Amino acid sequence: MDYRMCWLEYRGLPADVAGKLKDWFSSVSILEPGSSVLKDEIRRFSERSIGITPRFYSRPLKKEKYIMVGRLESLPIKLDVNLGEEGFMLRTIEWNGSKILLVTGETKKALVYGIFDLMKRIRLGEDIEKMNVLAKPKAKFRMLNHWDNLDGTIERGYAGNSIFFKDNRIIINQRTKDYARLLASIGINGVVINNVNVKKREVYLIDSIYLKKLKKLADIFREYGIKIYLSINFASPVYLGGLDTADPLDERVARWWREKARGIYDYIPDFGGFLVKADSEFNPGPHMFGRTHAEGANMLARALAPFGGVVIWRAFVYNCLQDWRDYKTDRAKAAYDNFKPLDGQFDDNVIIQIKYGPMDFQVREPVNPLFGGMEKTNQILELQITQEYTGQQIHLCFLGTLWKEILEFDTFAKGEGSYVKRIVDGTLFDRENNGFAGVSNVGDSVNWTGHDLAQANLYAFGRLAWNPDEEIERIVEEWIKLTFGDDEKVLENVSYMLMKSHRTYEKYTTPFGLGWMVNPGHHYGPNPEGYEYSKWGTYHRANWEAIGVDRTSRGTGYTLQYHSPWKEIYDDINTCPEDLLLFFHRVRYDHRLKSGKTLLQTMYDLHFEGVEEVEEFIKKWEELKDRVSPDIFERVKERLHMQLEHAKEWRDVINTYFYRRTGIPDEKGRKIYP
């Protein structure tokens, strides 16, 4: 095997712990037909962590201690619990003269989740004799979006090539199954396997030439409770069907999609549905035919509805041909302006997928006002696990801290307590089909994610999607212990690095919600005016005196899309959170912040501080040289040194840019290039 298994590397447990577990794992009763996945995982854990090979039975046992795995309905013990479709229970009980650790749920996938959770808890030191866990996911949809292309490349991928595709073929191998294991262990239940930008070759993924292989892929993922989805091109009836239109209100088009859906479900009965990027960045959509997003999405949804499928429709729609001289058009307003008027017009099996912020996964953005703005529409929160604008898995940038802030944001849509996490789990507006989507950071590299520590982003996404109330510090501790073991120094140093890393990255790149000071196209490295005169609506409009776009009620009016009190808070430069100051306001460089320092001096200071913090990360990592495996140590060390050099470049380019703009030097006399 030429890759590691991230947090599922089952290492040997301490001898005293393994000794206590041997009695439990020597005999396992699995009351579930077709339970090879359950047996395989238990066997793998037992052999590697405990040092024994368990014997499996399909009946209750007469034994002092053992594990029993089965659906609630198949247990010889009657339990009055409501677990739902995906919830599970781990409970140690005494029954019929035996001590039994029960792993139970109402479905097979619940048992899979339960087994992975049991292994995790044992590895984290919990006592099997006192196990009492009842866990249910908060959100129905917990998905990964792969931006993988059939040729094997990955759009915005920084961890090698696709694990799904190569040379226009679908790949199925041992790594496919291991990926399903990784995802099931963190509660992911859906995977979109191809890029939302569906090119001419990818259009054929819904055709019979690929469906036979897709069926095999779906069969593997199904065993782990995961449905597969496909991104589609809205104009497929033209490209594939030979029609002269893709108008969603044309009956020929609707019929074509109904027949195509039937063909897919003939191969994959539990196919999840379609992800659609329409009328966005030159992708075709219903606007081409004078139709609304609701009309386009509903037509597709009705083709899938008889089979239980859903349409996930991205809200990433804006004018991508803006003239930089146009001061009235504001890209930040686009998603709300396009979709808010359609609230309540989408079918029940349509879900609008909304990026966390109104722009495009910048280092920091405000929460998208569509969260709280659409009460009658299913919504999925889209987060970007892959680090397109946050260091591309060369820089250490743990995103879990940012995601937690987003989830805890109170929209005030129904008064105080209207948190984003309550919107995406469906409870605030009583919506069933809500959830999470994360743009995957996975490729075929040895560590799956390019940077070994970027695995923490994938792990944190899954854990937060399962339970957005989980403390991020706990998630970080779990990942470190599962990945590196129980070394306290490793836990201390890596936790420090992860928890600080996003703020550090923000400091030496674009603080204050500035954004977009990157090189066009590939989005790596500093370029203060790389997008300043482009068609993409990505402007900061810096001159010698001030910087930032006025998005207040006196400017573009973006602040008016929020509920009170946020519209008033963001509208006032004195109450606007400073970490978003330049997103909402045009600010003079001599404006005094709460610290008493000017905006410009703070900008200088932050960029120097950010570099110093990366130097600190390197020292922290060097202290772990003999405490983590040599290959991981060297890979992370190499990336941290690359990060340091690139952070210095960011510091010098951005500070020089502002110095040359303003002529105002750094008060502390540090090196800035005139």
Swiss-Prot record:
Single biological process term from Gene Ontology: glucuronoxylan catabolic process
Assigned GO CC terms: extracellular region
pH dependency: Optimum pH is 6.3 with more than 50% activity occurring between pH 5.2 and 7.9.
SUPFAM superfamilies (UniProt xref): (Trans)glycosidases, beta-N-acetylhexosaminidase-like domain
Keyword annotations from UniProtKB, A to Z: Carbohydrate metabolism, Glycosidase, Hydrolase, Polysaccharide degradation, Xylan degradation
Enzyme Commission (EC) number: 3.2.1.131
Binding residue positions for substrate: 155-156, 277, 314, 331, 355, 382, 506, 536
Root EC class: hydrolase
Residues of the site described as Participates in a stacking interactions with the sugar rings of 4-O-MeGlcA: 147, 536
Single Gene Ontology MF annotation: alpha-glucuronidase activity
Pfam families: Glyco_hydro_67C, Glyco_hydro_67M, Glyco_hydro_67N
Thermal behavior of activity: Optimum temperature is 85 degrees Celsius.
Binding annotation for beta-D-glucuronate: 197
Record's catalysed reaction(s): Hydrolysis of (1->2)-alpha-D-(4-O-methyl)glucuronosyl links in the main chain of hardwood xylans
Active site positions: 281, 360, 388
Metal-binding as UniProt keyword: no
Keyword Hydrolase attached: yes
PANTHER family linked to this entry: ALPHA-GLUCURONIDASE A (PTHR39207:SF1)
Family: Belongs to the glycosyl hydrolase 67 family.
Purpose of the protein: Alpha-glucuronidase involved in the hydrolysis of xylan, a major structural heterogeneous polysaccharide found in plant biomass representing the second most abundant polysaccharide in the biosphere, after cellulose. It catalyzes the cleavage of alpha-(1->2)-glycosidic bond of the 4-O-methyl-D-glucuronic acid side chain of xylan and releases 4-O-methylglucuronic acid from xylan.
The name this protein goes by in its record: Xylan alpha-(1->2)-glucuronosidase
Organism name: Thermotoga maritima (strain ATCC 43589 / DSM 3109 / JCM 10099 / NBRC 100826 / MSB8)
Lineage: Bacteria, Thermotogati, Thermotogota, Thermotogae, Thermotogales
